[in-house]
Amino acid sequence: MSIKILSESEIKQVANSYQAPAVLFANPKNLYQRRAKRLRDLAQNHPLSDYLLFAADIVESQLSTLEKNPLPPQQLEQLNAIEPLNAKTFKRDSIWREYLTEILDEIKPKANEQIAATIEFLEKASSAELEEMANKLLAQEFNLVSSDKAVFIWAALSLYWLQAAQQIPHNSQVENAENLHHCPVCGSLPVASIVQIGTSQGLRYLHCNLCESEWNLVRAQCTNCNSHDKLEMWSLNEELALVRAETCGSCESYLKMMFQEKDPYVEPVADDLASIFLDIEMEEKGFARSGLNPFIFPAEDA
């Protein structure tokens, strides 16, 4: 990984030099409020409105849990500067299971029969079983956990990682621009990339699907293999083109790119989920998705 989280002494050394931040850290409350509203707005007249509204319910349950049960200060002094909260190696607090219980409690009254069955399964699962499923998901062994359970477990894990990311230094610098495929905070996958407006006008940031951080990657470069060749942009509606898929002919992957200048309310997770028909189109063209949406997990192996 090529983005380093700076210590306090390193922050002081670069304090007088301005450059676009390599990493943007989320504002938890604002993020969940914006995402839930965007999901509900996108659900209007959408063929998959029921699922978008279900996703909005989960996001609102994350917000409610955040407000009722915030993460206490963690012992984070001896972390690596590179991927300090690495999803595969960081020793997580068991409070994430409390978050899962609270999220399930929030969703249960609104659940249909299928979702209710998933909630019941997770409520009856032992702590060891929940931790095992979490380990598989964090190791990116997504095919080993059924997608209906993964959505809830990931929502709780993400709420934990998002808050943990608030407790580490928030300054960073690029050490090597060639290896930016995974989140420099937790090592997880991107959901999509977003081209910013405002002080970061025109810069592209990838959005993490776990800790919700964003990291800068130059445009016209594959987000999966660094190739500058054989890149193409696709969209279902060229007139609007708020959400496009950037495909790479070198590694045959794709990741969506969104443009705030076309809609300042665009939100990576919500708009990625709502543009699932673009995913279908890309897969039909032979491209594999290089990122992961926290509401769309691969099917479990039979």
UniProtKB/Swiss-Prot annotation:
Family note: Belongs to the FdhE family.
Gene3D superfamilies, per database record: FdhE-like domain
GO function terms (MF aspect): ferric iron binding
Function: Necessary for formate dehydrogenase activity.
Protein's UniProt name: Protein FdhE homolog
Any single Gene Ontology cellular-component annotation: cytosol
PANTHER family noted in UniProt: PROTEIN FDHE
GO BP field: protein maturation
